[in-house]
Amino acid sequence: MTRPPLVRGIFSLGLSVAVLKGVEKTVRKHLERQGWIEPQKVDYELIFTIDRLKNLVDNKREALTAEQPDAGELSWRKVFNFISRQSSELDTRIYVLILLLSFLLPIAWTVLDGDRETTLEDKDNDCNVDLIENERRLKHYNDGERAVLQFGKNRSEPIILSYKDMNVLEGEHEFTSKEEHSNSHLTSKSENALNQVGSEDLLGCHLEKQLEEDKNEPNGEADGEDDNNREKDCSSSSEVESQSKCRKESTAEPDSLSRDTRTTSSLKSSTSFPISFKGSIDLKSLNQPSSLLHIQVSPTKSSNLDAQVNTEQAYSQPFRY
């Protein structure tokens, strides 16, 4: 396949050569009369007389044609004769100008067409470069930034990789901090009370074990020690009564403490700090320093109903709708 500019150049060159040959054939006689193609001996007087005679003949012909009405119809032969007659009377400078235009116009056409094609190719290359840069911009986020962008964040906004409650205002934030401080004070009081109850229950269990050991002792003692045993029994009975009173008080105190813990848990649930007690309260585990209350912080999720998810956000990391 040949290139289109080459075909156009060959066509324009052939056309210009054909025009040149035709012009040369039609104006050969006129050039000989004007002296462009000079013979070996030129008679200038004869040439001038011929021109004068020709002009006289032409003037007479025009006068005759003007007097006679044009009764004949227009035909292609008359048109061709008129064009040939007018072309034979043209100046040689007009012929030279026509030849130059026939050579230069095709060349200018090919040059301008080539510049247009290069501009279109440059525009296509610029568009491709812009698309590649946009694709690179879409892929420069890491995992943490993509996770933040999944929850309705725009790229124009600053990316915050740490948690920040966007729905709470500054005044509300101060109020919630005060409530958290008061709730922590209440939880510390309830923990101290539970520790005291646990210590009292441990003392009661220790005394019960001592009484059981006293009851299981052998009965092969002397009769003289019966009085002492009776006195011991009396003292032990008084101790048992005091222990039963302590137990009643201890049972009353956990009820009040359970109410306190309920109130504190309700306050904590309102401020999204729930205390999860599974089953009954294990006092021994509470007395140990390693066992602490498991406080689970549940941040408020921002509900953005107008958020839109694109393909990058959808395929970056799995998330919940």
Swiss-Prot record:
Additional remarks: Present with 1900 molecules/cell in log phase SD medium.
Keyword Translocase tagged: no
UniProt keyword Membrane present: yes
Biased composition (Low complexity): 263-272
Protein known as: Nucleus-vacuole junction protein 1
UniProt main location, coarse: nucleus
Region TSC13-binding: start-end pairs: 73-125
Gene source species: Saccharomyces cerevisiae (strain ATCC 204508 / S288c)
